[in-house]
Amino acid sequence: MSIPKELRYSQEHEWVRVEGNTVRIGITDFAQSELGDIVFVELPEVGAQLTANEPFGSVESVKTVSELYAPISGKVVAVNEELNDNPEYVNESPYDKAWMIVIEPSDLSEVDNLLTAEQYEQMINQD
């Protein structure tokens, strides 16, 4: 299972990549493996305001529907429309092709409250 060291992680299994003044968000390799084959992804519109720890969308797999939670607060500036036609990217490439949204954070320092790769790995190994 892949847990890239340069990313930050939420306890709800979202990953965060800081890219200058924006933040790219997706779900982790662990999350996609637990969900099974992803068949549908529901994401917010560009311009939507997100609040940290509040739902912003969902992923549907053959097993279940799981909500996505915003790891930090901010405004959605990009949505990965590729996932509409290719939800399987979430299983195949969770950290690259399957990024979900890009936000302009309300406060970039919120990223510091997220888990490091090491902390995330410890958390999932406790479950």
Swiss-Prot record:
Q: Which residues carry this modification: N6-lipoyllysine?
A: K63
Key words of the record: Lipoyl
Cofactor(s) in the UniProt record: (R)-lipoate
The cofactor remark states: Binds 1 lipoyl cofactor covalently.
What is one GO biological process annotated to this record? glycine decarboxylation via glycine cleavage system
Give the Lipoyl-binding domain ranges.
Answer: 22-104
- What's in the GO CC field? cytosol; glycine cleavage complex
Q: Does the keyword Isomerase apply?
A: no
Note whether Magnesium occurs among the keywords: no
Q: What does this protein do?
A: The glycine cleavage system catalyzes the degradation of glycine. The H protein shuttles the methylamine group of glycine from the P protein to the T protein.
Q: Which PANTHER family match?
A: GLYCINE CLEAVAGE SYSTEM H PROTEIN, GLYCINE CLEAVAGE SYSTEM H PROTEIN-RELATED
Query: NCBIfam families, alphabetically?
Result: gcvH, PRK01202.1
Family stated for the protein in its record: Belongs to the GcvH family.
User: Whom does it interact with, and what assembly results?
Assistant: The glycine cleavage system is composed of four proteins: P, T, L and H.
Tell me the protein's name. Answer: Glycine cleavage system H protein
**Organism from which the protein derives:** Anoxybacillus flavithermus (strain DSM 21510 / WK1)
Q: List the top taxonomic levels of the source.
A: Bacteria, Bacillati, Bacillota, Bacilli, Bacillales
